């Protein structure tokens, strides 16, 4: 059902009232005012052209669904780190990250108080994790 829905998000975004989409889009990806304002600025580029925004978002959802459908074996052969905000409510990212970590044993760092765009909610923490990760390579 999830893949089926992902493939059909473009018309949903095209017909969803723009002001509500703007509100849910900004609140859905970040917990900080800074992160929400960045998302709002990005979305406002498409103010007056919701159709284009829906096309771009729909394309992203479709390619994600197609990749999930193919379920290709792919081994990451370089040092890797998964980072996910505890309050990430964008789709099923929390579930995906848990499963990815479980299957691959790639380290997974949970960011308290952060949403989908955790780097905008907790930039110091993210930068610290990346610096630590890079120093151990």
For the regions a language model picked out, list residue spans one by one.
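Flexible "cap/lid" loop of the alpha/beta hydrolase fold
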Residues: 1-16
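Conserved alpha/beta-hydrolase catalytic His-Asp/Glu region
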Residues: 14-75
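Conserved loop-alpha-helix segment in the C-terminal half of the alpha/beta-hydrolase fold
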Residues: 77-114, 120
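Post-His helix in hydrolase/transferase enzymes
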Residues: 120-132
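Glycine-rich phosphate-binding loop signature in dinucleotide/nucleotide-binding domains
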Residues: 133, 137
């Amino acid at each position: 059902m999830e893949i089926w829905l992902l493939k059909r998000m473009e018309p949903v975004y095209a017909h969803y009232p723009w002001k509500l989409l703007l509100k849910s889009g900004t609140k859905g990806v970040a917990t900080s005012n800074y992160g929400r304002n960045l998302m709002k600025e990005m979305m406002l580029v498409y103010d007056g052209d919701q159709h284009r925004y829906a096309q771009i978002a729909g394309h992203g959802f479709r390619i994600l669904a197609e990749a999930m459908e193919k379920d290709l074996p792919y081994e990451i052969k370089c040092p890797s780190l998964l980072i996910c905000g505890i309050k990430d409510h964008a789709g099923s990212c929390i579930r995906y990250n848990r499963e990815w970590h479980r299957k691959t044993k790639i380290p997974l760092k949970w960011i308290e108080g952060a949403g989908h765009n955790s780097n905008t909610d907790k930039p110091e923490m993210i930068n610290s994790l990346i610096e630590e990760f890079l120093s151990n390579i």
